């Protein structure tokens, strides 16, 4: 199965795309890939969210053959991308959700400095009943906040869990010395926390020459000729992994005169 997150904006960062591929077999690592499209001359290096303008935050879940893909979209907010993600869950899924994220340079005595990121996603399960205040949503820029979905004991439980989460420190999330299971126990042991086995994740890309050819199969040879370089080739670059593909234009398109193996 596949989970895709995408941000499109009118700011200096035009697009952020991330794909997570679940393990194909038990015991195998999951795969993740990502890229960003941006205008370097317009980048604000001091305040990250100044690079994100008006736009949307989208989630796509594809559970595989025979299952209908699901897509949800919500507007961006100016505070943070994590607030936009929380807003998506509140607006589209009616699930109170909060994210705490940190990133930074981490260094140990044995290794050179490296960039690390870490985070906690807190979500109230199962869905609470509708409990939107009569005076409207209270989240950033008119979006629902997690508290807008809760009342009574559910709101009290949510507030208590957030109180625990507020004690997390940056080094606990990005430092290599504290295992995630130990951190979760420290934060939520009073709530009877249960920690599942960790899922290994590595970089992985699904691009291939066959996929490039498939994407070009909707074009005629006339269209393909407009994509041909001065050297007489059709080229394509994968934005995720940087792989380059160099193809004979007579072997691509729905009316290609030659077979690919003729190259």
Residue positions per predicted region:
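Interaction interfaces in information-processing and related assembly proteins
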Residues: 1-197
């Amino acid at each position: 199965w596949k989970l895709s997150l995408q941000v499109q904006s009118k700011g200096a960062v035009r697009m952020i795309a991330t794909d997570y591929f679940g393990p194909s077999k038990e015991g195998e690592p999951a795969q993740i890939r990502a890229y960003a499209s941006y205008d370097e001359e317009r980048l604000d290096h001091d305040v990250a969210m100044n690079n994100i303008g008006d736009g949307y935050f989208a989630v796509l879940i594809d559970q595989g053959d025979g299952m209908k893909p699901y897509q949800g979209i919500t507007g961006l907010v100016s505070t943070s991308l994590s607030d936009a993600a929380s807003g998506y869950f509140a607006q589209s899924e009616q699930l109170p959700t909060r994210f705490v994220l940190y990133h930074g340079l981490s260094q140990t005595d044995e290794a050179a400095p490296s960039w690390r990121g870490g985070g906690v996603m807190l979500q109230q399960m199962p869905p609470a009943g509708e409990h939107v205040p009569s005076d409207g949503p209270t989240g950033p820029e008119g979006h629902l906040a997690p508290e807008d979905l809760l009342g009574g004991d559910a709101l009290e439980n949510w507030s208590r869990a957030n109180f625990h989460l507020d004690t997390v420190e940056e080094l606990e999330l990005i430092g290599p010395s504290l295992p995630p299971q130990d951190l979760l126990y420290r934060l939520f042991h009073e709530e009877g926390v249960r920690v599942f086995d960790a899922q290994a994740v590595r970089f992985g890309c699904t691009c291939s020459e066959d996929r490039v050819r498939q994407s070009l199969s909707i074009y005629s040879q006339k269209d393909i000729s407009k994509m041909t370089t001065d050297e007489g080739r059709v080229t394509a670059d994968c934005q995720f992994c940087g792989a380059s593909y160099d193809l004979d234009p007579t072997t691509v398109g729905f009316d290609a005169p030659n077979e690919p193996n003729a190259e």
